């Protein structure tokens, strides 16, 4: 059984409170929030005021994914928003080890994300310190993209790296997740699946979350 983190990027922003309440009732394990700056990725989403508002009504831990340049500038703000996981991109951090330590020192779980074309070797020197590895199975920036199949073998390679290093990190995958791709990722060793469009575009999002969780 995998854990599920529905992505609020696919929620109805005119009725965000309603959608968060729905997720509270659901079997979702986390709420995934994507912060985009229009520089690191070609889109702008939302920032800390929205995350703070969500945290006031959310009953699930917040999984905050920063798709921005220089994410180390915002560690304290993310903490103050009530984040459980703070995820930064390896590609956006010159001093990745330092950023991971800053996140942990702030009292959050430290996570590092890799874009589809980034090799897993980028994690080699920090994997032992991580709580979570987020593998992108689409190129980040927009919801509703098609799944990149190479993510499946990437999950297996990160799983091996975690075992060899003695790390306790879990593996999360984000992008193009549905029942078919989710089953393949779970079989490969993924612990958490981020699902946006597949959940929020379904006729019964709560039932869809429950179905994903049974994979």
List each model region and its residues.
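Conserved N-terminal beta1-alpha1 strand-loop-helix module at the mouth
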Residues: 1-87, 92-95, 102, 110, ...
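Short, acidic/turn-prone active-site loops that include or flank metal/cofactor-
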Residues: 90-93, 115-117, 138-141, 197-200
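Predominantly soluble domains enriched in secretory-pathway, periplasmic, or organellar proteins
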Residues: 100-102, 118
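Short acidic loop-to-helix transition motifs that present clustered carboxylates
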Residues: 117-119, 178
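Glycine-rich beta-strand-to-loop/alpha-helix junction loops that act as flexible
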Residues: 173-176, 194-198
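Acidic, divalent-metal-coordinating active-site segment for phosphoryl/phosphodiester hydrolysis
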Residues: 176-188
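Catalytic cores of soluble, metal-dependent hydrolases
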Residues: 183-184, 193, 201-202
């Amino acid at each position: 059984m995998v854990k599920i983190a529905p992505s609020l990027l696919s929620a109805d922003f005119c009725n965000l409170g309603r959608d968060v309440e729905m997720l509270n009732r659901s079997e979702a394990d986390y709420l995934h929030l994507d912060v985009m700056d229009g520089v690191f990725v070609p889109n702008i989403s939302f920032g800390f005021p929205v995350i703070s508002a969500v945290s006031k009504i959310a009953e699930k831990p917040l999984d905050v994914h920063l798709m921005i340049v220089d994410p180390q500038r915002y560690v304290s703000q993310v903490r103050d928003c009530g984040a459980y996981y703070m995820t930064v991109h390896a590609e956006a951090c010159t001093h990745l080890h330092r950023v991971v330590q800053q996140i942990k020192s702030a009292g959050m779980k430290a996570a590092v994300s890799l874009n589809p074309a980034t090799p897993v070797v980028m994690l080699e020197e920090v994997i032992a310190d991580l709580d979570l590895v987020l593998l992108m199975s689409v190129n980040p920036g927009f919801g509703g993209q098609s799944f990149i199949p190479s993510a499946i073998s990437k999950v297996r390679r990160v799983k091996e790296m975690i075992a060899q290093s003695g790390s306790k990190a879990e593996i999360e995958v984000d992008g193009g997740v549905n029942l078919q791709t989710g089953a393949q990722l779970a079989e490969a060793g993924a612990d958490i699946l981020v699902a946006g469009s597949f959940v929020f575009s379904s006729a019964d999002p709560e039932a869809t979350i429950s179905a994903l969780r049974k994979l």
